[in-house]
Every structure is written in structure tokens, then in C-alpha cells.
Amino acid sequence: MIDAGDANPNLILILTDDQGYGDLACHGNPVIRTPSLDRLHAEGVCFRHFHASPVCSPTRASLMTGRYNFRTGAIDTYLGRSMMHPDEVTLPELLGAHGYRTGIFGKWHLGDNYPMRAMDKGFQEALVHNGGGLAQPSGRPGDGYFDPVLSHNGVWAKHSGYCTDIFTSAAIAFIARHRAEPFFVYLATNAPHMPLQVADEYSGRYLAMGLDEETAKTYAMITNIDDNVGRLLASLKELGLERNTIVIFLTDNGPAVSRGVDRFNAGLRDLKGSVYDGGIRVPCFLRWPARLQAGREIDEMAAHIDLLPTLLDACGAPLPDGLRLDGISLLPLLLGAAAPWPERTLYFQWHRGDEPEPYRNCCARSDRYKLVNGTELYDLIADPGEQRDIAADHPEIVARMRAGYEAWIEDVSATRGYAPPRIHLGTLHENPVTLTRQDWRGAEGWGNEHLGYWEVKVATAGEYDITLRFSARLPAREAHFRLGDNSLSQALDEGATACVFQRVPLPAGDARLEAWLEADGRRRGVSYVDLKR
């Protein structure tokens, strides 16, 4: 139970992007400088075996819903497979209903258009970039880590400074404005995700140590994050909010490391995208001075799906009747309760494609054993580096864990299937709508050589102005647009970068939207489609 004086604690969830378990000094990295995160680790409670999904959107969906990402629609990172279904109930929605002020600063990556944006899913304030990161096809032209173009509550504008500094400053300002109310801040940095862009004052320190450029810049971006965490913690103290604020730090998956680069990973096997522990075991520590004993470490296994029920439990916020969660509250563990902890098995899977394939890049993990791809078995107590496959010695464990996995994949797949949610056109919530290659379907990439389409819902019948935007470098003689029975084309002048179709009548309903360029019989995708009712 939570004392009345400690009810409704403030919540700050810090999630970094592609920072691995070994990318912290407190986890044994002999090179990186992370004093603020080390302090948070020392002053909080640390989960030694905390797990996320192998890549980012799936982790974010599970954090926001307390459910396995396969239930939510967010099964991958792009091509329409990172959009979370709008009927999923989210942590900020539940906290907002409990009287919390809610704000997100940084990376959402669960849908760029209505009704799937962060501002549609419970965040009352949202300063975010599109898609999976800055300087990607989902972003606005001229995007980058310095002076980025960001959406603030749906309004796009260029912001001065470095992305992580901007997001942290906005979070601190939000906290100051709402210090008299309980608040939930989701500070989700896009750093240290590639491209590796950071000030020379940060990277120079690591380059001087003789590190390769990739590692040096990655560590530099993490040290910048650490400096910003220090600013955030200092602001809590200055505002008198430190005691009853829960600060959670974790990362979204294992480290992203290029082939041939040797980076410290605390002895864990493999990297981002893998279901070996190097891909899914992540740092996680929580500081709550009012209730948690500093310096404790928890050996019990936990995962991203557990944070929503844990935080709701800490806040006394109720769950809606009938809402099914996969996670469980970790609050008894955090408070040091002596009650026995239930045994359970967690499941993780990720690969490209429109739906999961059984036994492809998957694992089932209990407190002791881990089954990888249905055939490899590891004793994680005796072999935390997952080097010795003992499947042949324990066929009964393999059979039991395979049965558990098969029941799990059938269950999560039956939730709603894997058809993507539709982007809505012509609503009051978003007009105009900009479609990007982030969410197109039918391709296996988002480069100029690829061609895709968008699954949309025309919410309001009427006339729309439609603009196709593209690079002048592309050879193109004609621009084409098609939605339902509407099929339009227009000749292009040499060097053109846009094509406008005016007052196009679109009927209400579900439809497939296509837009492409054509030259010499070859089709290429456009960069953006803008639709204004």
C-alpha cells in the first residue's frame, strides 16, 4: 500500500534509442562517461534482468499499453507496420483520466497521422519528430539533429539547438508549469540512434581516446543524454519535487553496431534486432525517494509490458473493466515485499514482414532457461552469455517451452490479426494530412527506387487539394495519383519538385491511395503526399 502523502507521485519515463546494456559506466563500461545515469542507478532500484523487444516501435507499444506488441499492430519499425491501433488504451490516457498532466518529448514512433499520433493517444502536450528518427524519410525537408523541424501539438516548426537538449528543456518547462499537479513526462530521446550527429565538444573526448568514429560518436551522444538527465534531476530538486517523483530510465533495445565495430556489451550475445540477450536485455532502474530503498538490485525477470501496471499501481489509478494486460505490477518487488514471486515465461519476437512467422527470430524466456527459435536452449544462470546450447540434454524443457510459445503466438495473433490501421483524411483533427514513406505499404524499403501505397479512410467526402512532393534529382515526366475510381496524371517540367491536383472529389470510406512518378516506363515513389479538404 502507498501512504496517502505519497499518493499520485509524479512520473518521468526516460527512454533512449539504441543504447545497449553495456553503454553505461555503472554496467562496467570502462570508457563511457555517464555520471548522472550512474547516480540514478545508485539512488534507485535496479532490475538486473529487464527485457525489451529487439527493436524500437514494438518496445514503445508495449510500454504504452502493458501488452505484447503483436496485439497492438506495432509489429515492426516502418512500412505501415509501426502504427498502433487507435483503440489501444495507453498509459497517458489512463493517467490523464486520473488527473495527471501528460507530456511527451522526443520519439513516439507509433503513428504519424490521426488517429495514431501521441496527441491523439493521451498526451496533452507533444513535442515530437515523425517516424523512427530525425533525418529519415518520415521527417520534414531539412531535418537533422541540429535545428530540427518538430511538431508541437500538431504545429510544425524549426527549433534551434540540438535535439536532445531541446526535448529535455521542453520537459523541464512542462514540469515547472505543472509542478502543482501530478504529471507524467515521457522523455524519449531519438539519440543515440543513427545518424550519429553530435557536437564536436562531445565526440572529441572519445576520438582522442583512439576509439573508432562510430563508437566515439555513439558514446558522445549518450554523454550528452547524461548531461541532460543531470539537468532534469537538478530541476526536480530546485522545484522541490524530488521526493515524490518516480524517475524511470530504460532503453528500447540492444545496441546498434555496424559490422566490424567492437563495442562493449557487458558480455551479452548479439545486438539490436536479435532475441539473444544482447538484443533484448536492457538497463532499467527506478528512483522514488519517498518509497524505494536506494541501491537495491532485483534479480527477478521483468519486461516492458510490466511498467504500465506498475506505474498505475504506484499512482492508485484504476484499470478499465475488461482491459486485458500481459504485464504485471512490479511494485511489490520494488517495495521489497517478502511474498513469493510467481514463475512466468516471457516471449519476444521480431522480423520484417507483414505478420509474424512462427519460430522466426523468437524466444521464450523463463527465470532460468531461454529457448531461441524453438531449437536452441540456454541456461541463463550458468551461461549468461548464451554460448552453450543444451537443447539436446533437456528435450523435456524444449518441448514445454515450445508448447508455451505456440500457445502465445496463437493467442496474440488472434487479438486482431495484422491488417494495419488506416490513416484518416478530412477530419478536423488533422487537415491537411501529410503521408510519408514511413507508413506506405507494399514495398520492402523507403528509398527512391521503391514504390508503395497507403491504406486510408476518407472520413469526410468532399473536394481535396492534393500535392505530390519529390526530389528534383528523380527522372520523372509524369506524376500520377489514384484513390478508388479517381485516377489522375499530370506532365512534369524538368526539375519539378511538386505537382498539385486541385479540387479532387473523394468519396467517404476506406480506400487504397497511390502516388508515383513515371519516366521511360519506370515508376518511382514520391516523398510526400499532402491532402487538404
Predicted regions and their residues:
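Formylglycine-dependent sulfatase
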Residues: 1-373, 380-410, 417, 434-450, ...
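Extracytoplasmic
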Residues: 398-533
